[in-house]
């Protein structure tokens, strides 16, 4: 089937999962973006000296980094090739020094960074949302508490008309339908944040499953990347999965409301992600190792997540490393509009200053 995106067309062997400016991935093909400016104007002298920057990792950030890449190419002529292969793959590739930067939604601790000779810094903030395939259930209408969500993924609640779900949704007609679980099959920062949240709200989940980029799921079918999970949920009636909000919105999927740590029912949005991030203490987080799920702020979305960029502290190619950092500097200075349009939260100026100071001290 043909899947159309901004400026190009591709042939896809899987069910279409669209993101503006992006393309989907499947188990046999990673997702990448390599953007060229669409112009018949001869390149300037500066553009003929353009560099190619390679990155790989989280599918969580792919919609945003794809748009940043296209706009950066148009502005500078430099080309960003980013492979959406999951956080685990991005960590592995940057450790193997096969790319210029890796991307992960799970921060590495200082000992792992030191062992690998890496530094890390945040790029943007977004949110993980439960998505469902239920007839006549509009986005945001189905309400779930954290413990309910954990019990569903534990397999303890197996029907959509279970009394516990009905109790949280008075007046909402729920079918006598089996709940089909969809989860990630690859190493995933999205999975890390989802399972980290469930571990905070369910002692049973923490004991039986725990948190990680990969976990032993009690049941369900696995999809590769946010793209794969979205595709499976769209195909399987009665299913529930979890994706980054941009994937849910662009594919017109039904997402749930969640009850946050303050007891409020909240909808996923850039505003609720910003509320969750508002009290994040980055200044005391060594190497920016901070997870912000289950935040206590008013209006906070419970599964808010940060994407992190990983780069080697030492390099034999100073010009290439400078070009890579220049890309992210450009994103921080010029990428707020794109972030807002795709429902991510741009980093606040004080955090950007902290990141730039980190670059100066850690990337030699």
From Swiss-Prot:
GO terms for biological process: phosphate ion transmembrane transport. Part of the ABC transporter complex PstSACB involved in phosphate import. Belongs to the PstS family. Keywords: Periplasm, Phosphate transport, Signal, Transport. Residues 25-50 are annotated as: Disordered. Gene3D superfamilies: Periplasmic binding protein-like II. This is Phosphate-binding protein PstS. GO terms for molecular function: phosphate ion binding. One of its GO terms (cellular component) is periplasmic space. It is found in: Periplasm. Phosphate binds at residues 58-60, 87, 105, 188-190. Residues 1-18 form the signal peptide. The complex is composed of two ATP-binding proteins (PstB), two transmembrane proteins (PstC and PstA) and a solute-binding protein (PstS).
């Amino acid at each position: 089937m043909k899947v159309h995106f901004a400026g190009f067309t591709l042939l896809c062997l899987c069910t279409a999962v669209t993101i503006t400016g992006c393309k989907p991935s499947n188990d046999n093909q990673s997702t990448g973006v390599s953007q060229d400016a669409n112009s018949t104007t001869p390149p300037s002298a500066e553009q003929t000296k353009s560099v190619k920057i390679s990155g790989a990792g989280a599918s969580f950030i792919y919609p945003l980094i794809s748009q940043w890449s296209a706009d950066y190419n148009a502005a500078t002529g430099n080309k960003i090739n980013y492979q959406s292969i999951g956080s685990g793959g991005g960590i592995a590739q940057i450790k193997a020094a096969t790319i210029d930067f890796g991307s992960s939604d799970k921060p590495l601790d200082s000992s792992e960074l030191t062992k690998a000779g890496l530094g890390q810094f945040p790029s943007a903030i977004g949110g993980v949302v439960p998505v469902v395939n239920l007839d006549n259930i509009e986005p945001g209408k189905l309400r779930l508490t954290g413990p309910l969500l954990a019990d569903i993924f534990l397999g303890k609640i197996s029907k959509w008309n279970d009394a516990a779900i009905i109790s949280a949704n008075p007046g909402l007609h729920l079918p006598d339908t089996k709940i089909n679980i969809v989860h990630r099959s690859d190493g995933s920062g999205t999975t890390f944040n989802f399972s980290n949240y469930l571990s905070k709200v369910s002692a049973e989940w923490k004991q039986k499953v725990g948190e990680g980029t990969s976990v032993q799921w009690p049941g369900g079918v696995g999809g590769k990347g946010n793209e794969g999970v979205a595709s499976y949920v769209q195909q399987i009636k009665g299913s529930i999965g979890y994706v980054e909000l941009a994937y849910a919105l662009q594919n017109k999927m039904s997402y749930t409301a969640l009850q946050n740590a303050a007891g409020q029912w909240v909808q996923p949005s850039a505003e609720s992600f910003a509320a969750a991030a508002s009290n994040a203490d980055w200044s005391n987080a060594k190497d920016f190792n901070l997870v912000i799920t289950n935040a206590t702020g008013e209006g906070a979305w419970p599964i808010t997540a940060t994407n992190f960029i990983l780069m080697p502290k030492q390099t034999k190619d100073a010009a290439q490393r400078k070009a890579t950092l220049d890309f992210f500097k450009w994103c921080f200075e010029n990428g707020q509009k794109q972030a807002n349009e795709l429902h991510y939260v741009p980093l606040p100026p004080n955090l950007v200053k902290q990141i730039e100071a980190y670059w100066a001290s850690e990337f030699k």
